[in-house]
Amino acid sequence: MVTIRADEISNIIRERIEQYNREVTIVNTGTVLQVGDGIARIYGLDEVMAGELVEFEEGTIGIALNLESNNVGVVLMGDGLMIQEGSSVKATGKIAQIPVSEAYLGRVINALANPIDGRGKISASESRLIESPAPGIISRRSVYEPLQTGLIAIDSMIPIGRGQRELIIGDRQTGKTAVATDTILNQQGQNVICVYVAIGQKASSVAQVVTSLQERGAMEYTIVVAETADSPATLQYLAPYTGAALAEYFMYREQHTLIIYDDLSKQAQAYRQMSLLLRRPPGREAYPGDVFYLHSRLLERAAKLSSQLGEGSMTALPIVETQSGDVSAYIPTNVISITDGQIFLSADLFNAGIRPAINVGISVSRVGSAAQIKAMKQVAGKLKLELAQFAELEAFAQFSSDLDKATQNQLARGQRLRELLKQSQSAPLTVEEQIMTIYTGTNGYLDGLEIGQVRKFLVQLRTYLKTNKPQFQEIISSTKTLTAEAESFLKEGIQEQLERFLLQEKL
């Protein structure tokens, strides 16, 4: 017969009582009233915060954007096809954040920082809020270091500095993405981390950009954040903030970063779609009233940090698409007023074979020569002036047939200067090569050549100077100034190559 031992039973009961946990977990829940078009209306969720993440029963995550008196408007970060009316939703108590680490370099990710390049998971120990406040006035210092794009027209006349925000604006198919990708290629060896954010583009276009960066070894220092045209509007809206959070991670670690948003018109359209579906009142061009804040809070995160914070920088190149050159539309005017200048690409110039199709007359950099080395300042001033005079004369010359010799010479010089600004895609030039090219043009060495010979001569001149006059490049890179010694090396090289070239052409 089994004996019952009372002491053993009482010990077991005591242990169980000690193990009993009286903690009460409070979950803020709600019920789905309606779902569709990437939007869900939730009843309940009484204590939810604006921008808080909520989780649906079947695993979809959403963001609470509209807090109304009797329901909460949630935008879905997925298709939400499995969400049913009446199913439960719980608030997570978290704001959207992403993991960040050095391991993201060379990878293609989506707006939630998940890899989409098929190369496995990315390890990360830290995380950052997708929307974090921009550095304040005390945390910044003025922009003073150049960020070279490798394009003569930009680096000489519309210079960009580290920590600046420069808008690239133009119609579709005018080479906006090409300017941005060339700038990434030119950062090779410059210790600059690049982030390319593709918003609402064709997957084939993004693949093309990634391939061209891989072929030239630029993916080593680049992160691509891509949300293609078939992505939900919520993710297209979040993608630029994800890119900014990744760039900020490196900026606060005393590194220099460059971020390209391609393009913000698509982000504004995604935000407009979300806002209209949430029944927010539409404003101009049916955009919601806070579309300016959408872009200003993103672009204000670009900064040149003060010496106390390590002097890191984040340079932003937002891209905006115009409709038949209309820069006075809502989104273009908004972004122009937020940024520190704009590079205007013209369809007419592009079709006339002037590529990059930069309209130098209406492009501007509000940082200006503070973002140039001294040697570039020395040669660029003359180029700007001569091109401006040429543009004026060219318009005047259309109405007059008999021009005096001086005017004809000025027109001829202007045409050759315009020729030297032309560059092939994915062929950025070093700052030394740019200086020698501009010097050759502004000092009349190209005047004796036919327009068709200019580019051929310049290519040969760069090679000749590199091999026969390496002292010129050494002086520029060490002193950052066009000294009298450097100028004499340059003059000798140009004269020697010009004689060789003219002999060659005669044969």
From Swiss-Prot:
Q: Write down which residues bear the modification named Phosphothreonine.
A: T257
Q: What is its EC number?
A: 7.1.2.2
Q: Which GO terms describe its molecular function?
A: ADP binding; ATP binding; proton-transporting ATP synthase activity, rotational mechanism
Name a GO CC annotation attached to this entry.
Answer: chloroplast thylakoid membrane
Task: Please tell me where ATP binds in this chain.
Answer: G170, D171, R172, Q173, T174, G175, K176, T177
Site residues, Required for activity: S363
The name on file for this protein is: ATP synthase subunit alpha, chloroplastic
> What gene is this protein a product of?
atpA
